[in-house]
Regions:
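Catalytic cores of secreted/periplasmic lytic hydrolases that degrade extracellular macromolecules
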Residues: 2-70, 74, 78-168
């Protein structure tokens, strides 16, 4: 009887641990929801996602918030595009029709792409040299889109729609 009680206690303990861990991962994975109801709500909830992700990213691999926000604004029309709302894809990431579980997951993938894909080596080199200004770093993202004026669009959004408007 004592062995059975010990086994039941052990099973109960491990079941409790699994439940607690599941809740932790559920809460942490869903802690930041990017909202698209209004421009300010989109910007600030997106920035909250970025801030949350940056907690687990080394400083030298982080990407300026205003640059991430500017690209999301361009790619989704302030979070209102069908691609953003049906596929949770904020950056036009196309590997087929790439769908994400959450919008914040698309931000995580964007950060991975910038930090790993050879097309953005110049971005990483400038950042390694201590350049953190979004306008300068934006110039290195020519290959993100086919539009030859894409980096000009990023700069325009940063200068006229983000800086001085939102506190990031």
């Amino acid at each position: 009887v004592k062995d059975i009680d010990t086994k039941i206690d052990a099973i109960s303990f491990f079941a409790a641990v699994i439940i607690v861990m599941s809740l932790f991962f559920f809460v942490s994975a869903h802690a930041v929801e990017i909202k698209t109801n209004t421009k300010p709500l989109f910007v600030y909830s997106l920035n909250s996602c970025i801030t949350d992700l940056n907690k687990s990213i080394p400083t030298e691999k982080q990407i300026p918030s205003e640059l991430i926000v500017a690209q999301a604004v361009i790619e989704t029309g302030w979070g209102t595009s069908r691609f953003a709302n049906e596929a949770n894809n904020l950056f036009g990431i196309r590997e087929g029709l790439k769908e994400f579980k959450t919008k914040c997951d698309s931000v995580k993938d964007y950060i991975r792409i910038i930090n790993k894909v050879p097309a953005y080596a110049e971005f990483r080199e400038m950042r390694a040299d201590g350049i953190t200004d979004s306008l300068l770093l934006a110039r290195t993202l020519k290959r993100w889109a086919a539009d030859p004026n894409y980096t000009d669009l990023i700069e325009d959004v940063i200068q006229h729609n983000i800086r001085g408007v939102y506190e990031l």
